[in-house]
Amino acid sequence: MAEKTVYRVDGLSCTNCAAKFERNVKEIEGVTEAIVNFGASKITVTGEASIQQVEQAGAFEHLKIIPEKESFTDPEHFTDHQSFIRKNWRLLLSGLFIAVGYASQIMNGEDFYLTNALFIFAIFIGGYSLFKEGFKNLLKFEFTMETLMTIAIIGAAFIGEWAEGSIVVILFAVSEALERYSMDKARQSIRSLMDIAPKEALVRRSGTDRMVHVDDIQIGDIMIIKPGQKIAMDGHVVKGYSAVNQAAITGESIPVEKNIDDSVFAGTLNEEGLLEVAVTKRVEDTTISKIIHLVEEAQGERAPAQAFVDTFAKYYTPAIIVIAALIATVPPLLFGGNWETWVYQGLSVLVVGCPCALVVSTPVAIVTAIGNAAKNGVLVKGGVYLEEIGGLKAIAFDKTGTLTKGVPVVTDYIELTEATNIQHNKNYIIMAALEQLSQHPLASAIIKYGETREMDLTSINVNDFTSITGKGIRGTVDGNTYYVGSPVLFKELLASQFTDSIHRQVSDLQLKGKTAMLFGTNQKLISIVAVADEVRSSSQHVIKRLHELGIEKTIMLTGDNQATAQAIGQQVGVSEIEGELMPQDKLDYIKQLKINFGKVAMVGDGINDAPALAAATVGIAMGGAGTDTAIETADVALMGDDLQKLPFTVKLSRKTLQIIKQNITFSLVIKLIALLLVIPGWLTLWIAIMADMGATLLVTLNGLRLMKVKD
C-alpha cells in the first residue's frame, strides 16, 4: 500500500492556486494521489515524492513545504520574516509606474510615447506572474481567473487602452493580496492553538530535573509544573494539588481543581500549586494535537454551499467567456456597431465576470467559524455539520451527564427525632459509616455529604454488617442495630411509625425525581435522606436560550422512571419528556423525530448514546476533552463539561449560514448589476475591476465577522 505523507503549505493564497498545486503534485512521477486541504493549508501526498519535488510543484506561487510533524512542534515555520516591500516589490513598482504614467498623461497627453511606455512597464512588471499562469492555461484551454484577466489585458492593449490595462493588473494584484490576507487571518485561529502548549517541559529523570523538548518526552516521564506555568503534555497528577485553567481546551472560564490521579491537558495553565505529572501521551497524540488535526480536517471538508459554488463556477467561467465574445462581436457584425467600443465592453465583461468573490465566499466563512468554535471549546468536524446545525429544528438530550451532572448527591436530610445538633451529627455519621461498607451506587453520595461537612466517619465501628437484597443494609453500632434502606423496608420494620406525614414527605421527594431512603433502628425512625442526580445549574438557561434561537422542540430522553423524568424535565424546561427508554428506544425515537422535524441533533456522552448520536443529523458529545471516543465519534464535541457551549454553537452555525447566503447573493448581484451596464454602454474596465475587487473584499470581510460571534 502506497505511503501517505502530510505536509503543511505556506503561501497558499487562493482556491485556484490550490487546485493547480494539487494537479502539479499529481503529475510527479511516483505520486498516485494528492489532496490539498485549502482551509488548513495542507497537502496529503500518496506515493513517493521528495519535499523538493513537492515544493517545485508549487514554485509558480513560491510555496514553502514543511513536514506536518515538524511544523506542528515549531510554528515558527509559518512566521513570514520577509519585509512588506520585499514581498510586494512588483506591486509597488507597478503602482509607481502607473502614478508617473498618469502624471505624464496630464502633462503630455495620453498619446505621448513616455505615457504609454510607463503604463506598458506597469503591466509587465505587475502582471508577470498573472501572464505566466494565464498563457499556460490559455494554451491548455483551462479557463481560470488568470485566463480571463490575461485575455482582458491583451485585449485592452490591442485597442490601445494601456492605462486601463495597467489598472486591471494592479487592482487584480491587490484583490489577490486581500484574499491571501483574509485566508491567513481565518487560519490564524488554528495556528494560535499551536502556540498554546510549551515546546519544552521540566522533566525529572534519574533524580535530576532538566528542560526537555516535547518531541523527546516519553510516556511515563514525570513533568514538574510550577505555579504560573503552562502544561506541555497530557498526563495525570502523581503529586501535588492545584487549580488549572483549562479555557484553552474546554472553554471553561473557571479554573478546575486538580488532585492526585486527575487528568491534565497540554496547553492548560497551572495557576496555584506545584504539580508532578506523569505523561500519558506522546506530543502528537495530546488532546490539543487531536483538536488541531480534526479542526484542520474539518476546514478541508466541503460544505454543501461550497460544493454548489465550486460546481457553479466550473460552468460559470466558460459561460462568461462566451458572453464576452458575443458582446464584442455581435453588435459590430450584425448592427454596425463600433468595433473598438464593443470589444472594450466585451473585455469589461471578462473582468467583471471573474468569479473571485464567488469562489472565496464560502471557504472564508467556514474556516473562520470552525476556528472560532475551536477557540471556544467546541470541536466541529466539518463545514457540513456547521450547516446542518444551522438548520436544526429539534434537539434531543440524554438526561444523565448532559442535563444533569451524572453524579448522585444528597439533596435533603430530614431529622425525624428531636435531639441536639451533636446527636443529629452522630446519627448521620452512623448512617454514613454503614454506607461505607455498602456496594450501593448511591452510597458514595451519603459518604461525600458527610466528608464535606468534616464529619469523622472513622470514629464509628460497625459490626455484623448485612446487605438486605433489594431493600437496604443493616449493621450494629455500640450494641444497637441500625438500618438504612427504602421506604418498603421500613414499612415492614416499623409499620406503626410510618405515619401519613412521613409518607407525604417521602412522596414529595420522589415526585421531585429524588430517591428517598430512611435511617433508623427496629424501634424508631431517625431520619429521611434524599439523593438525586443533580441538575446542572446551566441546563434551564440553555434550554430557554435554544428556544429563543429558534429550536422548535427540545426533548429529554432517559432510562429513568417516568416520575423522575417528569420532575427533572419540568425543572429544566424541555418541551417533551420521554422516560423508561432502552438504547434501542432512543434510536427509534430519534428516527421518528427526523421524520417529523427533518434536521435533529442528539446530545449525549458519546459512548452510552452512540446509536442515537449516529442516527441524528448531528451527534453532539459532551466532555470531549476527557474522552478520545467522544472526540473521534461525534460530529461535534463540547470539549468542556459545559452545556452552555451548545447555544453558542447553534448561534455561530446560524450566523455562518446567514453570511454564506449573503456572500453568494452579493457576489452574483454585484456582477449582474455590472453586466447590465453593458446595455447603455456604461461598463468600463475601471468599473469592472472595482466591482470584482470590491465584491471580493466585502465578502471576505463579511466572512471574518464570524471571528467575533459570541453567545
From Swiss-Prot:
Expression induction: By cadmium.
Molecular function (Gene Ontology), one example: metal ion binding
Binding site for Cd(2+): C14, C17
SUPFAM superfamilies: Calcium ATPase, transduction domain A, Calcium ATPase, transmembrane domain M, HAD-like, HMA, heavy metal-associated domain
UniProt keyword annotation of RNA-binding present: no
Domain HMA residue range list: 3-66
EC number, UniProt record: 7.2.2.21
Biological role stated in the UniProt entry: Couples the hydrolysis of ATP with the export of cadmium.
Gene3D superfamilies: 3.30.70.100, Calcium-transporting ATPase, cytoplasmic domain N (3.40.1110.10), Calcium-transporting ATPase, cytoplasmic transduction domain A (2.70.150.10), HAD superfamily/HAD-like (3.40.50.1000)
Name of this chain's protein: Probable cadmium-transporting ATPase
Keywords: ATP-binding, Cadmium, Cadmium resistance, Cell membrane, Ion transport, Magnesium, Membrane, Metal-binding, Nucleotide-binding, Phosphoprotein, Plasmid, Translocase, Transmembrane, Transmembrane helix, Transport, Transposable element
Membrane-spanning segments: 89-109, 111-131, 151-171, 317-337, 347-367, 669-689
Family annotation (Pfam families): E1-E2_ATPase (PF00122), HMA (PF00403), Hydrolase (PF00702)
Subcellular location: Cell membrane
Key word Transmembrane present: yes
Species assigned in the record: Listeria monocytogenes
Reactions that this protein is recorded to catalyse: Cd(2+)(in) + ATP + H2O = Cd(2+)(out) + ADP + phosphate + H(+)
Family: Belongs to the cation transport ATPase (P-type) (TC 3.A.3) family. Type IB subfamily.
Topology relative to the membrane: Multi-pass membrane protein
Gene: cadA
Active-site residues per Swiss-Prot or TrEMBL entry: D398 (4-aspartylphosphate intermediate)
Record's GO cellular component terms: plasma membrane
Class of this enzyme: translocase
Domain of life: Bacteria
Listed InterPro entries: ATPase_P-typ_cyto_dom_N, ATPase_P-typ_P_site, ATPase_P-typ_TM_dom_sf, ATPase_P-typ_transduc_dom_A_sf, Cation_Transport_ATPase_IB, HAD-like_sf, HAD_sf, Heavy-metal-associated_CS
